[in-house]
């Protein structure tokens, strides 16, 4: 066997990268062309993956953010180096603050120019250090210095973006690595890796303790956040609310996880919440927080006299979230559970039906909620039907709501 025959067949990384994304089910990539990512764009020309080209990188980042929110899967953003990456920063940071999964693939200067300060290199504190810009808000930032490591780094990037508390990650790739050739077997081995991690749930004993406390409570309230949407636990939440007859307040990110016209939905809390809603959460004896971070605006800057008064001698908190750091961050927690919301609510629903086969009695607060909605509707009729120009925001949203089916986003 000759030396030439013994060498494994190799292929361009850019071509293999695109095939990898196809295999993962990626259908769209958002970004803008630049000389550091042109090799990937060339490989995309014959691919089923559609490249959404925009006029500014911030647009691509916001588009990728919105796409991930709708699909529930990590979106892909392809960025040019330095100014391209900094232009995208606001959109990526916004996704990070809202826990939206995103894989940012950024081109960078050629690796053989490290230390020479080539065109558009970020190098004030270290050579080729543009990835450092993203460190404060991505879950992890990789700089790919070895071509052969890109396949496993990219696999880790997708898993990390979508697991636990989701969020963006950055894979920083020198432009010469996109055009390098490596053994396709390095990519093939990633196909054997699981594409979804098993998420933690809640044990029956803890579930029974939670149901017992909520059943014995005189004024329990649910407070739900965006974690319910990220877990796609809409049906499980509705079943739990209907069976337990507990009113539901929500954060800004939790709006829509239970239909606004559900008879037990109180509405948003905090600065943008109504007085009626804040009064219910303030006077609750037990609060079940689901997938929420108890952020400042949703909690009236945590002043105990406005929205939540949680602590000794006041409301008691049960908090379920996928991220351990969120438990007890802003309020003392009686029962804290690290779990995926969909899995946890399935267990809670099962245990609730075992303990309360017929459910709790209809909550008398339903009538007060209906009265409050009628009052607000009457109060807003004039603005929602106004013929004023420029158009009133209330009129715009009323018309959009009327024109769209209930389950559509205007």
Report residues per predicted region.
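Glycine-rich beta-alpha junction loops
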Residues: 36, 109-110, 173-179, 226-228, ...
